[in-house]
Structure formats: C-alpha cells, structure tokens
C-alpha cells in the first residue's frame, strides 16, 4: 500500500485529490496521514469528504477514515463504473470545481454524468468560468473534450451552486506545448448573481480598458442571473495564443468596487503573459497529471509549491521519467 504524508510540501487538499485520482486510475490503494496538518482546520472538511465520497462511489472503493476532521484515510479502489448519473452535494460553499478536477479523468470515455452542488465562484479555487474558458480549452488541445453545464452559481458563504459534467471523450496523445505563440485575442465572462447588472458591465469595461494595451480583439460577455441563493460577482478572462491559453479571474466582495475587480483580473492576465509561457501558473499545476499520464511537456508562467507537491504525489503512483526545469517560467516534461 502506498503511504503518503499529507503534511509535506503544500500540505493541503490537493495531495488528497491527486491521490484519489491516480489511485483510481492505477488501482493502487493508499494510506494518507497528517491530512491538511498545516491548515487552521486540520483534517477532512466537507469539501474534501465530498471528493472522497464521489470517487468512492464512482470506483466502488473501500474506504476507512472518511469523516469530518479525520487526519488519516485508507482508500482501496475497485473498478470504475461504466455508466450512470450521479449527484454529489458538498452542503456548503465548498468548491465544485476542485471536485470536478478530481473526478474528470475517471469519466473519460464512460457513459457517466455527474452533478456537483456547492460553490462555483469561491476564493482559493478555480472559478467555474476558468474551467469553461481555460481548463476545458487546454484539454481540447491535448485531445480531451467534455461538457460542463453551469446550472446555478454559488458564492461564499451561501453556496447553492450547481454544475453538471457529461460526455467526457477523447483519445489523448503525447503532447508538446511550450510556447504561447502569437496573441490572437481575449475572451471573458463577467457575471453577477442577484445583483444589479451594472456591476457586471463595470467589471467588463474596466478590464477591456487594460486589455486594449495589447490587442483590440476582446470578447467579454455578460452572465446575469437573478433569484440565485447567493449574491456575488466576478470576472474571468483568457488570452488565446496560437499554441497556449492564459487565464486569470477575480471575485467581487463587499466594499470592493466593480472597476477594481475588472482591473485586478486584467492586470493578473497581463502579468502572466509576460513570461511567454504556454499556460498560467494555475494551469501549470492542473496539467501536470495529464502530462504524466500521456507523456506531455509544457511551460507555465510560475512554478508554485502546489506544482512541486503535485509532482511528488504523482511519482508515488506512476513511474514517470519527468523533469522540472526553471521556475518563472518552468518546463515540465515527461518522456
């Protein structure tokens, strides 16, 4: 059984999520201890427990230690289900997109539809629009497509969001994406939930003003939703290159001007673009698992502790001939 110290490196939930995914794909059981030991609230929280439960059900796994506050978990996967329609409810504003990341590789070329309820636009996790504008488009470039439907948005602290993942298809091949290439344009989504539409407009306008410094081809659409359980706003932007895609987002909050939200996302995007890496730092972390599975290489703008930790977890399950070169930007290559 693979033994994993959940406190090493970044020491957060990503260690558990990557372990769940790779354990299911390789059919290698694991024991993880010191789960989130470095966090203010150590152990499994509702969001992590939902990820465990989702993978448990999808893989017919045997699990010990799956309760709130648990700092040790033993996970023994079975066979991945071939078809079915499943619903997983976090019950809080915990991130639906982090659970999406965990289970997506398990759904590939299977007749599975998964609905996840919780937060869609919450701090310290990819927004649902980042998944739609950046993550899904990057996966298309390596041969994987999927549908992700945004049914309801969920902001912190109320949650109430809902997404549905289906039709995960593809024949991923070895890939090499090491340059961003010529900038083709910008796309984005500026949203409000149960708030005045002018907030989304102002977020959009302030972002456009900054992005025009590089290119006039900008397509930011508005997503205005009324009657949602949670109130909130945000904007997600992506820069489309000939080879790469760079994303950045920002969330609104009480007392924060809408113009500031748009400027924050746009300035983050321009900063990411300066390195000429194919992908942004968040995508650099998320793509590492796929590069390890399908022998890929890519560059990303900044090597984070998340990425370093993720690579070490991957090596626990897969015997990869991989290397990391540089830091800002960095190259990850698996041969």
From Swiss-Prot:
GO molecular function, one term: RNA-3'-phosphate cyclase activity
Catalytic activity: a 3'-end 3'-phospho-ribonucleotide-RNA + ATP = a 3'-end 2',3'-cyclophospho-ribonucleotide-RNA + AMP + diphosphate
Major enzyme class: ligase
Active site: 306 (tele-amp-histidine intermediate)
Sequence positions that bind ATP: 101, 282-285
Subcellular localization(s) per the UniProt record: Cytoplasm
Cellular component annotations (GO), alphabetically ordered: cytoplasm
EC identifiers of the protein: 6.5.1.4
Entry annotated with the keyword Ligase: yes
Cytoplasm found in the keyword field: yes
Keywords, ordered alphabetically: ATP-binding, Cytoplasm, Ligase, Nucleotide-binding
InterPro entries hit by this protein: RNA3'-term_phos_cycl_insert (IPR013791), RNA3'_phos_cyclase_dom (IPR023797), RNA3'_phos_cyclase_dom_sf (IPR037136), RNA3'_term_phos_cyc (IPR000228), RNA3'_term_phos_cyc_type_1 (IPR017770), RNA3'_term_phos_cycl-like_CS (IPR020719), RNA3'P_cycl/enolpyr_Trfase_a/b (IPR013792), RPTC_insert (IPR036553)
GO biological process annotation, one example: RNA processing
Residues in the signal sequence: none
Parts of the chain that traverse the membrane: none
Pfam families xref list: RTC, RTC_insert
Role noted for this protein: Catalyzes the conversion of 3'-phosphate to a 2',3'-cyclic phosphodiester at the end of RNA. The mechanism of action of the enzyme occurs in 3 steps: (A) adenylation of the enzyme by ATP; (B) transfer of adenylate to an RNA-N3'P to produce RNA-N3'PP5'A; (C) and attack of the adjacent 2'-hydroxyl on the 3'-phosphorus in the diester linkage to produce the cyclic end product. The biological role of this enzyme is unknown but it is likely to function in some aspects of cellular RNA processing.
Family from the record: Belongs to the RNA 3'-terminal cyclase family. Type 1 subfamily.
Name by which UniProt lists this protein: RNA 3'-terminal phosphate cyclase
Organism: Sulfolobus acidocaldarius (strain ATCC 33909 / DSM 639 / JCM 8929 / NBRC 15157 / NCIMB 11770)
Lineage of origin: Archaea, Thermoproteota, Thermoprotei, Sulfolobales, Sulfolobaceae
Gene this chain is encoded by: rtcA
């Amino acid at each position: 059984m693979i033994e994993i110290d959940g406190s090493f490196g970044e020491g957060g939930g990503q260690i558990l999520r990557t372990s769940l995914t790779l354990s299911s794909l390789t059919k290698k059981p694991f024991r993880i201890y010191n789960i989130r030991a470095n966090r203010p609230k150590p152990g499994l929280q509702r969001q992590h427990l939902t990820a465990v439960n989702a993978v448990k059900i999808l893989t017919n796994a045997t699990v010990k230690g799956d309760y709130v506050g648990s700092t040790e978990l033993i996970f023994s996967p079975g066979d991945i289900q071939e078809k079915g329609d499943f619903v997983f409810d976090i019950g809080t504003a915990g991130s639906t997109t982090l659970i999406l990341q965990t289970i997506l590789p398990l759904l590939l070329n299977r007749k599975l539809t998964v609905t996840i309820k919780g937060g869609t636009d919450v701090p310290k996790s990819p927004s649902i629009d980042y998944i739609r504008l950046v993550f899904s488009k990057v996966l298309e470039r390596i041969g994987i497509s999927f549908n992700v439907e945004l049914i309801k948005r969920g902001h912190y602290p109320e949650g109430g969001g809902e997404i549905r993942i289906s039709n995960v298809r593809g024949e991923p091949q070895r890939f090499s994406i090491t340059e961003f290439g010529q900038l083709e344009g910008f796309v984005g989504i500026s949203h409000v939930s149960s708030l005045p539409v002018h907030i989304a407009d102002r977020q959009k306008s302030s972002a456009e003003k900054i992005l025009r410094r590089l290119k006039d081809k900008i397509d930011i659409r508005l997503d205005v939703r009324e009657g949602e359980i949670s109130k909130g706003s945000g904007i997600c932007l992506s820069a489309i290159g000939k080879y790469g895609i760079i994303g950045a987002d920002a969330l609104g909050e009480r007392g924060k001007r809408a113009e500031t939200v748009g400027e924050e996302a746009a300035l983050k995007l321009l900063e990411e673009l300066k390195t000429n890496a194919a992908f942004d730092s968040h995508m650099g972390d998320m793509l590492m698992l796929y590069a390890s599975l399908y022998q890929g290489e890519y560059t990303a703008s900044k090597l984070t502790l998340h990425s370093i930790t993720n690579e070490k977890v991957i090596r626990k399950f897969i015997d990869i001939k991989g290397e990391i070169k540089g830091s800002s930007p960095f190259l990850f290559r698996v041969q």
